[in-house]
Amino acid sequence: MSGRGKGGKAKAKAKSRSSRAGLQFPVGRIHRLLRKGNYAERVGAGAPVYLAAVLEYLAAEVLELAGNAARDNKKSRIIPRHLQLAIRNDEELNKLLSGVTIAQGGVLPNIQAVLLPKKTQKAAK
C-alpha cells in the first residue's frame, strides 16, 4: 500500500452551462427563474439554454441597430432615442414590441403626404 488513495483523475474545473452553450446570457439564472416563476411544474434541461440563446440574439439585434442609429447621429453613446429609432424602423422588431413604450424615446419623424407643399410646374419658355 503506497497510500496514494484511489488514483482517480483530478476533478475537472467547473464549466458554466452558458460557456458550454457558447452564450453570454446566464443559463443557470434563467433556469432558476423558470423554476421559481410557476410557469410549469417541471423545467427541462434544454429549455433555459434555448431561452438564453433567444434572449441573447434579440439583445444583440436591438443593440446592433441602436448602435447604427447612434452612429448615424454622430454619437458614441446609445440613448433611449436611438433604441426607439432602431426598433420602430425595423418591421419585425416593431411588430414584436408594438405594445412597448420607451421612456425618453420620442416619436418617428413622419409628415403626411397631403400636408407637404405642392410642387409647382414652371412654364417652359
From Swiss-Prot:
It holds the Pfam family Histone. The modification N5-methylglutamine is found at residue 104. The modification N-acetylserine is found at residue 2. GO terms for molecular function: DNA binding; protein heterodimerization activity; structural constituent of chromatin. InterPro entries: Histone-fold, Histone_H2A, Histone_H2A/H2B/H3, Histone_H2A_C, Histone_H2A_CS. The keyword Amino-acid biosynthesis does not apply. Residues 1-21 are annotated as: Disordered. SMART domains: H2A. The keyword Membrane does not apply. Residues 1-18 have a biased composition (Basic residues). It is found in: Nucleus; Chromosome. The nucleosome is a histone octamer containing two molecules each of H2A, H2B, H3 and H4 assembled in one H3-H4 heterotetramer and two H2A-H2B heterodimers. The octamer wraps approximately 147 bp of DNA. Core component of nucleosome. Nucleosomes wrap and compact DNA into chromatin, limiting DNA accessibility to the cellular machineries which require DNA as a template. Histones thereby play a central role in transcription regulation, DNA repair, DNA replication and chromosomal stability. DNA accessibility is regulated via a complex set of post-translational modifications of histones, also called histone code, and nucleosome remodeling. This is Histone H2A.
